[in-house]
Amino acid sequence: MVQISEVQEQSSTAYTRTAAHTHIKGLGLDEFGVAKQVEGGFVGQAEAREACGVIVDLIKAKKMSGKAILLAGGPSTGKTALALAISQELGPKVPFCPLVGSELYSVEVKKTEALMENFRRAIGLRIKETKEVYEGEVTELTPEEAENPLGGYGKTISHVIVGLKSAKGTKTLRLDPTIYESIQREKVSVGDVIYIESNTGAVKRVGRSDAFATEFDLEAEEYVPLPKGEVHKKKEIVQDVTLHDLDVANARPQGGQDVISMMGQLMKPKKTEITEKLRHEVNKVVAKYIDQGVAELVPGVLFIDEVNMLDIEIFTYLNRALESDIAPVVVLASNRGMITVRGTDDVVSPHGVPPDLIDRLLIVRTLPYNREEIKTIISKRAAVENLQVEDEALEFLATLGTETSLRYVLQLLSPSGIIAKIANRAEISVADVEEAKLLFLDAKRSTKILEQSENYL
């Protein structure tokens, strides 16, 4: 007997990568804006989450643009998680541009230019366009000729009569001779389903009407059903772009399709700066669209982590950029206390931010987690990583988290899971965590070893 067996499909969901903040789903607030103790992947930090909830409401109401927020707190207190939760609460339609302070330093592009680029990335433009479309099956296609106005025996096409049929009726259109050229290019014949944009005169052949599907043809045709509704339709198309997209489109016009221009594009890998004049022109066009009601400005969020890495020049530029007419909400994060502002010798300021900018910021403080909160976070994270942890091991990890750091115990979960798997255990035990702890040092133990072997290393 011939052996036949089915190959089981492996689902791709089992191989999704688990990142540091995969478990964050939102701020975890109720309908009154009050933070629940454990919700949306967050544990604790009630005051900070409620403050971010107010900020989200202000952004949605478009009353927050041009203002800046500082998330201040120690390492592993959830500053990046809060910024990520803000972006998830706002949804995919609101631009969210994350970057680290050190990203702004480049050999090719000025620091201020790199900052302005990210500013423009965080501002969206929603363009609404109403398109009038004629769609249907071609029942008649008659070009009408007229005498050539230049004389001679030749004839010119004055207009084209096209009959279109849809499920709800038929229409006969008189089209411009320029549209006839598009019809010829698309090789349209009677029985084809086409649509014509009335604004641009663009013609698109969708396919052959399925009424002709029984015809024998040597060429393989794509048969489509008769369009539903009326022949004349109005469609509203919404496009979401950022101001940076518009800047780039105008700064680098596409070359031709010939070999020379394509080679030219390959030979120019250097990043070109977008001039202030070009941005001003783009802003003018955007303002005109907004006045006409065609477009709507969507101020997004620019998140700058490790803000203490920025220098005094960038901070000075940031002051001016925040006061401009078109500015996003800027969220800064810092885990430093009183330090010298980069680029200065004697200006010591909180969080590494100059005093004049600190005065403009709304500061949200994140607090260290207590033992119970660390325990809840570990159990949540273990569930995300599909790991089972014994109660004793969970208690041990929570105690270890208070002695070392939250990040260290979260990073111990995966190695402990592998050790438990090798020992054929379904759940992670205290012995597995102890073994992983011996294999991987935390920062305090590593520092202690370095101090003891000071003369050796």
Swiss-Prot record:
<dbReference type="InterPro" id="IPR027417">
    <property type="entry name" value="P-loop_NTPase"/>
</dbReference>
<keyword id="KW-0805">Transcription regulation</keyword>
<protein>
    <recommendedName>
        <fullName>RuvB-like helicase 1</fullName>
        <ecNumber>3.6.4.12</ecNumber>
    </recommendedName>
</protein>
<dbReference type="Pfam" id="PF17856">
    <property type="entry name" value="TIP49_C"/>
</dbReference>
<keyword id="KW-0156">Chromatin regulator</keyword>
<keyword id="KW-0539">Nucleus</keyword>
<dbReference type="GO" id="GO:0006281">
    <property type="term" value="P:DNA repair"/>
</dbReference>
<comment type="function">
    <text>DNA helicase which participates in several chromatin remodeling complexes, including the SWR1 and the INO80 complexes. The SWR1 complex mediates the ATP-dependent exchange of histone H2A for the H2A variant HZT1 leading to transcriptional regulation of selected genes by chromatin remodeling. The INO80 complex remodels chromatin by shifting nucleosomes and is involved in DNA repair. Also involved in pre-rRNA processing.</text>
</comment>
<dbReference type="InterPro" id="IPR027238">
    <property type="entry name" value="RuvB-like"/>
</dbReference>
<dbReference type="InterPro" id="IPR010339">
    <property type="entry name" value="TIP49_P-loop"/>
</dbReference>
<dbReference type="GO" id="GO:0016887">
    <property type="term" value="F:ATP hydrolysis activity"/>
</dbReference>
<dbReference type="GO" id="GO:0004386">
    <property type="term" value="F:helicase activity"/>
</dbReference>
<comment type="subunit">
    <text>May form heterododecamers with RVB2. Component of the SWR1 chromatin remodeling complex, the INO80 chromatin remodeling complex, and of the R2TP complex.</text>
</comment>
<dbReference type="GO" id="GO:0008094">
    <property type="term" value="F:ATP-dependent activity, acting on DNA"/>
</dbReference>
<comment type="similarity">
    <text>Belongs to the RuvB family.</text>
</comment>
<dbReference type="InterPro" id="IPR003593">
    <property type="entry name" value="AAA+_ATPase"/>
</dbReference>
<keyword id="KW-0347">Helicase</keyword>
<keyword id="KW-0234">DNA repair</keyword>
<dbReference type="Pfam" id="PF06068">
    <property type="entry name" value="TIP49"/>
</dbReference>
<keyword id="KW-0804">Transcription</keyword>
<keyword id="KW-0547">Nucleotide-binding</keyword>
<dbReference type="GO" id="GO:0005524">
    <property type="term" value="F:ATP binding"/>
</dbReference>
<dbReference type="InterPro" id="IPR042487">
    <property type="entry name" value="RuvBL1/2_DNA/RNA_bd_dom"/>
</dbReference>
<keyword id="KW-0227">DNA damage</keyword>
<dbReference type="GO" id="GO:0005634">
    <property type="term" value="C:nucleus"/>
</dbReference>
<keyword id="KW-0010">Activator</keyword>
<feature type="binding site">
    <location>
        <begin position="73"/>
        <end position="80"/>
    </location>
    <ligand>
        <name>ATP</name>
    </ligand>
</feature>
<dbReference type="InterPro" id="IPR041048">
    <property type="entry name" value="RuvB-like_C"/>
</dbReference>
<dbReference type="GO" id="GO:0006325">
    <property type="term" value="P:chromatin organization"/>
</dbReference>
<keyword id="KW-0067">ATP-binding</keyword>
<keyword id="KW-0378">Hydrolase</keyword>
